[in-house]
Amino acid sequence: GSTSYIYDTSAGSGTYAYIVDTGIITSHNGFNWAANDIISKSYSNYGTVLDIFAPGTSVLSS
């Protein structure tokens, strides 16, 4: 198949993407590019909740 892609280099400029998920490891070194843009908020009535599977990290990196 073709490996050439043609796209407007300004595509997506000025847009925002919001990811709402559990278990985002905001300190992951793969997110250095977005370190100032990641907002982590817990709405749990039970204090800090640890999501050991961290599926949000995978979602954010996609």
Curated annotation (Swiss-Prot):
Keyword flag Chaperone: no
Major localisation: secreted
Induction (UniProt): By gluten.
Leading EC class: hydrolase
GO BP terms: proteolysis
Activity relative to temperature: Optimum temperature is 40 degrees Celsius.
Molecular functions (GO terms): serine-type peptidase activity
EC number: 3.4.21.-
Assigned protein family: Belongs to the peptidase S8 family.
Protein name: Alkaline proteinase
